[in-house]
């Protein structure tokens, strides 16, 4: 029976407790990708239990604590390590490389999956009588209990063993960097794909699953199947994207342009519909040329940031295009990028220094050394 993902035990046989949970999880309307994500997290948990010689239905809070400690101290498997030797931040994109250890979000997600797994068996009376994963509580009991939907959630202290997640600004690609990236693309297919990504703000998997029947050049819209709800939604895209798409479609064999077929195909025979991994490979090749570490999701963030910077586009319009359920999720794109903040403050400081010089004054030196000595050493006024 579906959901097509299983967790195998040391004997190569599916783990019954996980199998029944994943089936129940899938029947509740979850996507196959969500089932895969939960299965991988449960596999990580069961591997820890097997190493510790612990039964899954006899674990305690202490076992969960030891599991979190192991994730904080354990390096990822070599196949998962993508960080090259060198600095922690890419010089081209300004983005950090993937860490060699598990991120706080990964640990928290793993705890959420384990908690849901034991909640299921608690209701089914097939597991321990108490969920071993600590729950976040408020003064009134369960977090979010009696919450007024018109008010924002008030986040109290984290549940035990939950990791502190740093607040990060929304990622986006600066205009100059995007021009360099677009120039490095080698085919009309890749240019059309990226142009749709950066103008429609569609999720990578949503655009990869696009069919040519859902491309409406007349209305400048495409229809995508939303990742979460599964609903089909029309979203706008730029005229440049449709122009590149037409050039790409005209170069395809006639049998691949019949209505209802995939909008994207592999470049070599035998032709196959483009999948998510192949789309990621397009960006990986560009990253090798540019020395960057951009991802497909960066295009979605870039589109959102561009719309947020346009005063003619309301935040509710951005929310609708992005497919966000909560407006608070969209508000993250109202914050400026770090490079924009630095540029703006530098302009302010330069303007202030110029105003002081124009008034006949002398800007205060940030150094305790003589201004003449600093000028001789560094030249000009760049050190100021």
Residues covered by each model-derived region:
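N-terminal core-binding DNA-recognition domain of tyrosine recombinases/integrases
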Residues: 19-33, 43-150
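Catalytic-site neighborhood detector that most strongly recognizes the C-terminal catalytic loop/helix
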Residues: 226, 322-347
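C-terminal secondary-structure termini that scaffold catalytic or DNA-interacting sites
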Residues: 348-384
């Amino acid at each position: 029976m579906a959901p097509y993902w299983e967790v195998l035990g040391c004997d190569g046989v599916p783990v019954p407790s996980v199998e029944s949970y994943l089936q129940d999880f899938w029947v509740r309307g979850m996507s196959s990708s969500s089932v895969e994500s939960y299965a991988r997290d449960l596999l990580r948990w069961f591997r820890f239990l097997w190493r510790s010689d612990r039964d899954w239905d006899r674990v305690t809070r202490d076992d969960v604590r030891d599991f979190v400690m192991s994730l904080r101290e354990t390096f990822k498997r070599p196949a998962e390590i993508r960080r090259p030797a060198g600095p922690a931040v890419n010089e081209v994109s300004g983005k950090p490389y993937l860490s060699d250890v598990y991120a706080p979000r990964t640990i928290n997600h793993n705890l959420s999956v384990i908690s849901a797994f034991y909640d299921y068996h608690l209701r089914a009376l097939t597991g321990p009588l108490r969920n071993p994963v600590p729950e976040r509580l408020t003064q009134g009991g369960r977090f979010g209990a009696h919450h007024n939907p018109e008010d924002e959630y008030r986040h109290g202290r984290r549940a035990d063993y939950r990791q502190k997640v740093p607040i990060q600004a929304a990622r986006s690609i600066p205009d100059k960097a995007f021009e360099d990236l677009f120039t490095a693309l080698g085919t009309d297919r890749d240019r059309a794909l990226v142009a749709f990504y950066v103008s429609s703000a569609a999720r990578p998997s949503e655009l990869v699953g696009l069919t040519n029947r859902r491309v409406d050049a007349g209305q400048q819209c495409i229809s995508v199947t939303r990742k979460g709800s599964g609903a089909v939604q029309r979203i706008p895209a730029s005229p440049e994207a449709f122009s590149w798409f037409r050039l790409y479609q005209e170069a395809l064999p006639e049998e691949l342009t019949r209505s209802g077929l995939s909008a994207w195909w592999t470049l070599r025979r035998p032709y196959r519909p483009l999948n998510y991994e192949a789309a990621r490979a397009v960006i990986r090749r560009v990253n090798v040329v540019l020395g960057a570490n951009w991802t497909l999701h960066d295009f979605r963030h870039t589109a959102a940031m561009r719309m947020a910077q346009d005063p003619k586009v309301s935040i509710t319009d951005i929310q609708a295009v992005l497919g966000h359920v909560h407006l608070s999720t969209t508000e993250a794109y109202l914050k400026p990028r770090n490079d924009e903040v630095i540029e703006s403050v530098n302009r302010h400081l330069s303007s202030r220094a110029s105003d002081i010089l124009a008034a006949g004054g002398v800007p205060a030196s940030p150094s305790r050394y003589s201004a003449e000595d600093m000028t001789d050493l560094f030249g000009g006024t760049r050190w100021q």
